Amino acid sequence: MALQVDAPDVSSYDELYNRAVELLKHQQRVLIGLAGGPGSGKSTLCAILAKAWNERFGSEIVKIIPMDGFHYSLEELDRFDNPEKARALRGAEWTFDADLFYSLVRLMKKITDRELYAPSFDHAIGDPVVDDICVEPKNRILIFEGNYLLLNKPPWSDACKLYDIKAYLPVEHSVARARVAHRHLVSGLCATEEEAIERTDRNDMINLTFVEKNMVTPDIVLQQLRLKTVKTSSL
């Protein structure tokens, strides 16, 4: 199985950029909540946009804060009522510390004149890394990205009220399925293509449908990222 994503034309996302720049004229920091289901390409897009926008400004004005850092740790999942289910369905909305996420968004909104820290996620160990992302005063555009950032249930919906711009990256289900199964396989999370597909259908595709059915109205719906090549026997 081989899969790539076309590098997007950054100008296709100028509406998002222009809104952020306009807001910067009147406030010190702009918070963007960029949501999309599993396999939508949101992490890829955010990295591309951050690089392009930082180059335009000539400084590191953009900082990305992924939702992945707010996974409950494996140790915390093992304290759930059903730890086996929690581990098997890790990535579902309830396996994230949404209260911690909301608290951090609120902090980033309020405090702009000193360094703050957010957690990252280390895929090698399968757990969050506390205070791994440093947000500095020069980081005036913060892009929070993740599956559940636009959910219409608290505390996710409380965080939504703090975003200056709510953006959504849609994806076709067949595309998402191919991307996520490929990711599970190449990361070593699944040993075979069949196992990767089964895990994707059991968990990620359900999460994608949940995101689509339970989100607030975004301010901007972004252009989908396109698949360049998919070569596989099963997808």
UniProtKB/Swiss-Prot annotation:
Binding site for ATP: G36, G37, P38, G39, S40, G41, K42, S43
Matching InterPro entries: P-loop_NTPase (IPR027417), PRK/URK (IPR006083)
Alphabetical keyword list: ATP-binding, Cytoplasm, Kinase, Nucleotide-binding, Nucleus, Transferase
Pathways involved: Pyrimidine metabolism; CTP biosynthesis via salvage pathway; CTP from cytidine: step 1/3; Pyrimidine metabolism; UMP biosynthesis via salvage pathway; UMP from uridine: step 1/1
Record bears the keyword Nucleotide-binding: yes
Compartment(s) of residence: Cytoplasm; Nucleus
Protein name: Putative uridine kinase C227.14
